[in-house]
């Protein structure tokens, strides 16, 4: 597929058979509804996508303790090939034709389908009634912000929900954004915050001076299971219309396995976690004051 430096691509991270299968399903959606658009996939097994003409698959080895922050590598690869990239979770679906020039890539910076300023994100913490998980997330994010001389409670800093967002080049600010995200990813993971990467995305963008804005992402009709449940609850969608997408995702993401297979997978996951955590601790010793004081 031709790579247009002035155009855009979709991109995702798909490691492990379950997510490779889901990404392949998404690739077929993109081929159908956005036929001239490349889909950049970072994956542990590029050969799984060799028969999918719209996919540009690149070998990826897990870098984060858990995979959440590795999304930045998919974005970096997309931006090395195109002017804009739209990150989309591998377990999502595209449901209708996508415009050749989506509005979400028309402005430099980050345009997210879901984002909110940090005071709103942590309103329960600031009001004094958070749950334990949110409080831990707030404490780690606040310390991370202070390391970059930022104030987490600043209304101009946004938490970015990472399932669907576009990044358009902005005179090199996008490169600094990715650099700061890497720093923040390590800090958050060292402090036990492996997910909620929207904190790192928002703080990194603020530090780099990269604009962040919300958008309804007009022209990108999508399925995301947890979003769809909310739509159904609000009467904006019907379960009978979306049932096939729920069924396909469940079948691929949670396939039936023998108990022996489950034990092996769980053991391998634990070993990888411990290895990646040890690796992170060793690598961050080179900047001891930043990460450990």
Region spans (language model):
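Glycosyltransferase catalytic domains, chiefly GT-A lineage
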Residues: 1-293
């Amino acid at each position: 597929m031709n790579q247009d430096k002035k155009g855009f691509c979709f991109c995702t991270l798909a490691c492990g058979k379950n997510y490779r299968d889901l990404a392949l399903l998404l690739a077929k959606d993109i081929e159908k509804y956005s036929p001239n658009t490349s889909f950049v996939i970072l994956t542990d097994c590029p050969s799984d996508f060799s028969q999918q003409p719209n996919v540009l698959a690149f070998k990826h080895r897990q870098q984060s303790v858990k995979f959440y922050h590795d999304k930045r590598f998919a974005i970096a690869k997309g931006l090395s090939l195109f002017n804009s990239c739209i990150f989309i979770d591998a377990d999502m679906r595209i449901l209708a034709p996508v415009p050749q020039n989506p509005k979400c890539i028309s402005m430099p910076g980050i345009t997210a389908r879901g984002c909110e300023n940090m005071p709103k994100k942590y309103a329960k913490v600031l009001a004094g009634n958070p749950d334990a998980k949110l409080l831990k997330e707030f404490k780690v994010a606040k310390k991370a912000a202070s390391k970059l001389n930022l104030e987490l409670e600043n209304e101009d800093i946004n938490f970015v929900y990472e399932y669907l967002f576009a990044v358009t080049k902005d005179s090199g600010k996008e490169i600094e954004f990715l650099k700061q995200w890497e720093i923040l990813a390590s800090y958050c993971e060292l402090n036990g915050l492996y997910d909620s990467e929207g904190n790192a995305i928002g703080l990194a963008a603020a530090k780099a001076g990269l604009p962040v804005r919300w958008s309804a992402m007009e022209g990108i009709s999508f399925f995301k299971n947890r979003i769809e449940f909310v739509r159904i609850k609000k009467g904006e969608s019907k379960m009978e219309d979306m049932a096939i997408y729920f069924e396909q995702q469940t079948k691929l993401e949670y396939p039936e396995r023998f108990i022996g297979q489950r034990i092996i997978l769980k053991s391998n996951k634990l070993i990888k976690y411990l290895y990646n955590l040890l690796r992170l601790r060793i690598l961050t010793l080179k900047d001891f004051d930043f990460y450990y004081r």
